[in-house]
């Protein structure tokens, strides 16, 4: 969990896409993130990015590692709302959000990762999709429509305006989908492509290309139990 390589790439980047989990960069590494945020540049957070970092160390006085998800993406780690590794997630468009350019060409998304609990979004956040808990990890499994956990469904994708450590405003997009196996779904890939285009000021096409660049054979998410890994 200690250290994070390659953060110097943020110095010239237009967009940060983050999917880390409970990392603890050293002070030199963290400064690249702080400088990026202070420039007001956009951020895309995938699934575990709500708890991307851990510890009381700080990016700045107003932003500790533990606070990154809540302050920059709008949410922190809360819970597994669905049964982990048993129930999946199916996207449902939030009423009033269908006109968002980020949803252009995005059909129903199925994510084998379970629905996360999301409880800290505010009226200033824009929910685009909610996640319905499904009976199993099979893409054809039924939505548990009568399950109280789907009343209401938890947010699955949203837009957030963050305040950087130096007070500058920036924009972020977050989805609690995004485990490796989730990206088998073309519509999830298109959602992320659309968000990247939108947040960097581009015009989102009616149906962005979201094909794999190289063959993609994801392994199911789990911890690696090998000693010393």
Regions found by a protein language model. Give the residues of each.
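Extracellular ligand-binding/catalytic regions of CAZymes and related secreted enzymes
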Residues: 135-229
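Stable alpha-helical elements in mature extracytoplasmic
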Residues: 9, 29-33, 98-102, 188-192
């Amino acid at each position: 969990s200690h250290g994070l390589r390659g953060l110097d790439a943020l110095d010239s980047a237009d967009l940060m896409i983050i999917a880390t989990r409970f990392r603890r960069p050293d002070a030199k590494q963290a400064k690249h993130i702080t400088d990026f945020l202070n420039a007001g540049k956009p951020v895309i957070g995938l699934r575990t990015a709500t708890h991307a970092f851990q510890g009381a160390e700080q990016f700045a006085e107003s932003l500790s590692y533990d606070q990154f998800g809540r302050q920059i993406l709008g949410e922190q780690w809360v819970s597994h709302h669905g049964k982990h590794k048993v129930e999946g997630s199916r996207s449902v468009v939030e009423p009033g959000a269908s006109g968002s350019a980020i949803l252009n060409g995005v059909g129903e998304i199925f994510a084998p990762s379970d629905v996360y609990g999301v409880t800290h979004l505010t009226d200033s956040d824009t929910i685009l999709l909610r996640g319905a808990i499904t009976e199993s990890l099979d893409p054809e499994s039924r939505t548990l429509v009568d399950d109280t956990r789907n009343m209401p469904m938890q947010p699955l994708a949203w837009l957030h305006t963050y305040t950087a450590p130096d007070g500058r405003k920036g924009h972020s997009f977050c989805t609690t989908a995004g485990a490796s196996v989730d990206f088998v779904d073309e519509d999830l890939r298109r959602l992320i492509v659309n968000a990247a285009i939108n947040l960097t000021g581009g015009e989102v096409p009616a149906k962005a290309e979201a094909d794999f660049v190289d063959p993609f054979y994801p392994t199911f998410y789990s911890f690696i139990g090998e000693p010393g890994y």
